[in-house]
């Protein structure tokens, strides 16, 4: 099952995607996150409502303004989770890389964009990079969950583009220059396009057997299997829930493979279009514009 959010008369509405068409879910919930809060991963009632003809047809997917599937309370990201990505940056896999994942947070309240919405380059943007990533959406409250149990807490999966400013912005701090963190360089408005769907977990037999493909203006830049992750989806959930409680709708982005612009020198330019495809999750497409 593929869930999404779309814009209707200025309001974001929840929907169900079926064979190119979108059916409204507003009679069942206010939002996709609201639905997860109420029902967790037990979403079979949506399919039943559709089968019974109780969901109104909103329109064709291609004709709707698609927004990110949901707004998470927490957006947690993993850096350096593919060996080839570490090595392309000049590093080597070290013992510490396999002991614990490198987690960072970006504000979930930033202006996130959905499928076909613009990635906007502001005047300060200099070296803007793309990062195609598998994102995990939690379906249940999770605390101290083992990797073996983690699948039971996942609502589904979506596509995330961890757009990043690579210019080493420096600020003055106590008479000593200090480079700004991931929190800043990955948190510009419109960075982090997400979607187009929340594909429910029952449609993904193995999250470690998916291929991530990224094209920029028709040129393939990334192509790698999630088999190459250092930490699996379920291991990441186990690690994170040792320290914090994950809630329904929280998103974990699981890292990007090799092929990013910071190593190839091919950064995003106004006029580009970024297309990220992941098996069974669809394609997330965003144009790049200069504001």
Map each language-model feature to its residues.
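N-terminal non-catalytic cap/leader segment that marks the start of a structured domain
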Residues: 1-101, 273-277
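A generic local secondary-structure boundary/capping motif
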Residues: 4, 65-67, 91-94, 119-128, ...
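Short beta-strand-to-turn element immediately C-terminal to the catalytic PLP-Schiff-base lysine
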Residues: 6, 16-18, 25, 105, ...
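Short beta-strand segments
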Residues: 7, 77-78, 105, 129-139, ...
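Catalytic-pocket segment enriched in acidic/His residues
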Residues: 8-9, 45-50, 59-65, 69, ...
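Structural signature of FAD isoalloxazine-binding scaffolds in flavoprotein oxidoreductases
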Residues: 94-113, 130, 270-280
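Non-heme Fe(II) oxygenase catalytic core, chiefly the N-lobe of the double-stranded beta-helix
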Residues: 109-168
